[in-house]
């Protein structure tokens, strides 16, 4: 986790969702706009809140399945998006519907843009 600990007060718990790979229509280049050419995109996210007592049941936990379902159902259905930055902001807004969260990090990486191993990515770290 790459959060700057100096910005966090007290102890926190974190749920991470890693290596979610989707095929999305995203990009500004002509070849990225082709309807039959979806971009392979990886999403990694961390959601933090102040440390809670040990949970008595699942309802007291950060629901990573809610985040996963949103990414895997809503994003592929939304059609073409020019910028991964737009997707990152969208994820932050969705994650913060959980009012217990105090910090969210999302990193979106385009996996097949270049012919070599280079991978452009965009990251947001937002504190509430």
Residue ranges of model-derived segments:
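N-terminal, polar/charged subdomain of small-to-medium soluble alpha/beta proteins
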Residues: 1-128
């Amino acid at each position: 986790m790459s959060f700057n600990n100096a910005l966090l007060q007290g102890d926190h718990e974190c749920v991470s969702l890693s290596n979610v790979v989707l095929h999305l229509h995203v990009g500004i280049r002509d070849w990225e706009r082709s309807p039959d050419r979806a971009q392979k995109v990886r999403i990694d996210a961390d959601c933090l809140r102040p440390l809670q007592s040990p949970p008595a049941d699942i309802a007291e936990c950060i629901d990573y399945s809610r985040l996963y379902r949103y990414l895997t159902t809503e994003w592929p259905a939304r059609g073409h998006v020019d910028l991964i930055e737009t997707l990152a902001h969208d994820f932050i807004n969705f994650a913060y519907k959980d009012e217990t969260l105090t910090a969210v990090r999302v990193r979106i990486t385009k996996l097949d843009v270049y012919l070599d191993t280079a991978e452009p990515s965009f990251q947001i770290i937002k504190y509430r």
